[in-house]
């Protein structure tokens, strides 16, 4: 795989990092890319796809905490490989800097360029391993003080669990010591699940899937061996059980369709007691990736009704009910619903006492948007929208509106019930007792309700 250029742009289009490896693509590619992304309106889509071609140049990009990580090339390369490379470069830089934002990039541009020159040579990838790079990187990171950091959604998804973990968990460099030269011995394990659910217009589940990963980030000196135990009732493959029954709270076992492990993981006792053994490499890495298609109880139930209210009017009612326990809080919830193309105006009515909620009608793409700051488990929220049309509608209005889609983050909650039962670290001495942090988070990948 070969790329010509790599660069990082801010949300404003400012060029933060730029490296031209092969001099095959015009120097103005950064401006071409940003202009294309900012004003993308092809095929009715508001956002540019991760891959597109302009004047014979292929542009690949991923957006990480508000920054565009971009690669360009004129040759035909595997899109999935380039997108994975961009994600890994972002992860390596985050491992070294502790946090990804403009400030940390600008304070550490010498280190960032040193990393890029080791990761990619003349357009060819050499390594994306933080552990391997430590032997070749000699610049020390300038760690940005946590007080200077602005809250960023993807990096702050665990803040709801502050009582369980330190607030600086996601802002530490794996190579820089804490002030005073001492390094705090600790390890973080994150169980992150992205769920995809499609509801029928009657509220029944049509498709459901979980893409999960167990991420580990180690700040342990000496690379001690770690044993990580999962549910004893974990099964790989469906084992002939029905895939249409909800699992009860008592549990009938966790059934994964398939999974794969990091190369450092040893599976000697996995079949007998579901224990993983490994010596963690430096940096953040996925211990295990897994997929589950057995039907599960979705965290939110969405009911939507749209009906005519006159020749040029209609009313929409969207009701959301949280199906998780009351001690769990979901945050950064966004509900979107495409409206008929001839919608000219929308007025909204929220329930009495509604707080932390915003509504908007995006006229450019005829989109209804409802943002909620948080939803407590067991809570129910309703939005009413009155639509005004510029012309009479003919036929069934439900065929010209929807579906309703949701995005959300639920800290300290996972729908698959996969759990880390214990995290054991080989002791160097009787007084060695590093901090262990285990965190769970559920996010929406594709959460859609038809109307």
From Swiss-Prot:
Keywords for this protein: Coated pit, Golgi apparatus, Membrane, Protein transport, Transport
Organism: Arabidopsis thaliana (Mouse-ear cress)
InterPro entries: Adaptor_comp_med_subunit (IPR050431), AP2_Mu_C_sf (IPR036168), AP_mu_sigma_su (IPR022775), Clathrin_mu (IPR001392), Longin-like_dom_sf (IPR011012), MHD (IPR028565)
GO biological process: intracellular protein transport; vesicle-mediated transport
GO cellular component: AP-4 adaptor complex; clathrin adaptor complex; clathrin-coated pit; cytosol; trans-Golgi network
Record's subunit section: Adaptor protein complex 4 (AP-4) is a heterotetramer composed of two large adaptins (epsilon-type subunit and beta-type subunit), a medium adaptin (mu-type subunit) and a small adaptin (sigma-type subunit).
Protein family (similarity comment): Belongs to the adaptor complexes medium subunit family.
UniProt domain MHD: residue ranges: 184-450
Cellular localization per UniProt: Golgi apparatus, trans-Golgi network; Membrane, Coated pit
Coiled coil (residue ranges): none
Tagged with keyword Transport: yes
Protein encoded by which gene: AP4M
The protein's name: AP-4 complex subunit mu
Function as written in the Swiss-Prot or TrEMBL entry: Subunit of novel type of clathrin- or non-clathrin-associated protein coat involved in targeting proteins from the trans-Golgi network (TGN) to the endosomal-lysosomal system.
């Amino acid at each position: 795989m070969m790329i010509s250029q790599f660069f990082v742009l801010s949300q404003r289009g400012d060029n933060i990092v730029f490296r031209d490896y092969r001099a095959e693509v015009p120097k103005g590619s950064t401006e071409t890319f940003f202009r294309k992304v900012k004003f993308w309106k092809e095929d009715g889509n508001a956002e540019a796809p991760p891959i597109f071609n302009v004047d014979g140049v292929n542009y690949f990009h991923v957006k990480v905490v508000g920054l565009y990580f971009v690669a360009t090339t004129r040759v035909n390369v595997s899109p999935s490989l380039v997108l994975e490379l961009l994600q890994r470069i972002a992860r390596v830089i985050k491992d070294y800097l502790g946090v990804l934002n403009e400030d940390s990039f600008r304070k550490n541009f010498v280190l960032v360029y040193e990393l890029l020159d080791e990761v990619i040579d003349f357009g060819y990838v050499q390594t994306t391993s933080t552990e391997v790079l430590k032997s070749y990187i000699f610049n020390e990171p300038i760690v940005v003080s946590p007080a200077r950091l602005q809250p960023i959604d993807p990096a702050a998804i665990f803040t709801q669990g502050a009582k369980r973990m330190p607030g600086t968990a996601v802002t530490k460099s794996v190579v820089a010591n804490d002030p005073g030269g001492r390094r705090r011995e600790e390890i973080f394990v994150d169980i992150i699940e992205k769920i995809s659910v499609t509801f029928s217009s009657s509220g029944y589940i049509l498709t459901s899937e979980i893409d999960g990963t167990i991420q580990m980030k180690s700040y342990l000196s000496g690379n001690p061996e770690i044993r990580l135990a999962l549910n004893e009732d974990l099964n790989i493959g469906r084992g002939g059980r029905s895939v249409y029954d909800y699992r009860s709270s008592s549990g009938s076992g966790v059934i994964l369709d398939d999974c794969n492990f990091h190369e450092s993981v040893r599976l000697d006792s996995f079949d007998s007691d579901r224990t993983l053994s490994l010596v963690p490499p430096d940096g953040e890495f996925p211990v295990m990736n897994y997929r589950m298609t057995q039907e599960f109880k979705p965290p939110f139930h969405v009911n939507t009704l749209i009906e005519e209210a006159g020749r040029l009017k209609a009313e929409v009612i969207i009701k959301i009910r949280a199906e998780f326990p009351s001690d769990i809080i979901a945050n950064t919830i966004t509900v979107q619903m495409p409206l008929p193309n001839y919608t000219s105006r929308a007025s909204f009515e929220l329930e009495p006492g509604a707080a932390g909620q915003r509504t908007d009608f995006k006229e450019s793409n005829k989109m209804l948007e409802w943002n909620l700051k948080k939803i407590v488990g067991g809570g129910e929220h309703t939005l009413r929208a009155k639509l005004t049309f510029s012309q009479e509608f003919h036929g069934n209005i439900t065929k010209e509106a929807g579906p309703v889609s949701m995005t959300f983050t639920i800290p300290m909650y996972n729908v698959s019930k996969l759990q880390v039962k214990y995290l054991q670290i080989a002791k160097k001495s009787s007084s060695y007792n590093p901090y262990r942090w285990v965190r769970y988070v559920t996010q929406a990948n594709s959460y859609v309700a038809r109307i």
